[in-house]
Regions:
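Short linear motifs at secondary-structure transitions and domain/linker junctions
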Residues: 6-11, 39-42, 70-71, 93, ...
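Catalytic-site signature of metal-activated, phosphate-bearing donor transferases
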Residues: 53, 76-150
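Weak global preference for isoleucine
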Residues: 4, 33, 48, 65, ...
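Active-site-proximal specificity loops/subdomain of glycosyltransferases
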Residues: 2-20, 24, 30-66, 72-77
């Protein structure tokens, strides 16, 4: 089973593409979890990690994907993603590229993100690492893109 979780508070006001994102996630996952609807009006970094951890904890999938509400998967990526899940069961995560798009044909690789998490084999993953308190850790150590399949 594959779960995707995301967070948002007031996506209409922020003009987030939330409806499109949720439809995209439903096409990929067996369940979609949304947290953060009760986020405090005053922003704090620790709230991000808490909401991400809530999403991970509520997810029932063997694999769990953390998606920001403005992240999307390309429809042609599904088969490749499912193959990566099958071939990476001994790892706590899979890193995927994050692209920054400027125009339809102009984009660049921005970074690699460890947002696909193996909850079945590593249920103790925490989303409390990094300067923003929301990167994936295992046993207190940051899960880095260089330590997992890409």
């Amino acid at each position: 089973m594959l779960s995707i979780f995301t967070t948002f508070t007031d996506p209409k006001k922020r003009m987030d593409p939330w409806e499109e994102a949720l439809e995209c996630y439903k096409d990929f996952a067996d369940e979609v979890i949304v947290t953060g609807k009760d986020w405090k009006p005053e922003f704090t970094w620790k709230d991000i990690g808490k909401n991400f951890q809530d999403g991970f904890n509520l997810s029932n999938g063997d694999w769990v994907i953390r998606m920001d509400i403005d992240y999307f998967f390309h429809e042609k990526s599904k088969e490749r993603l499912l193959n990566a899940l099958k071939n990476s069961t001994d790892y706590p995560a899979i890193a995927i590229p994050q692209y920054q798009f400027f125009t339809v044909g102009r984009y660049q690789l921005k970074t690699r993100l460890c947002i696909i998490l193996n909850k079945k084999k590593f249920p103790n993953i925490k989303l409390n690492g990094g300067g923003d308190y929301c990167l994936a850790t295992l046993n207190g150590s940051l899960i880095t893109p260089n330590s997992v399949p890409n």
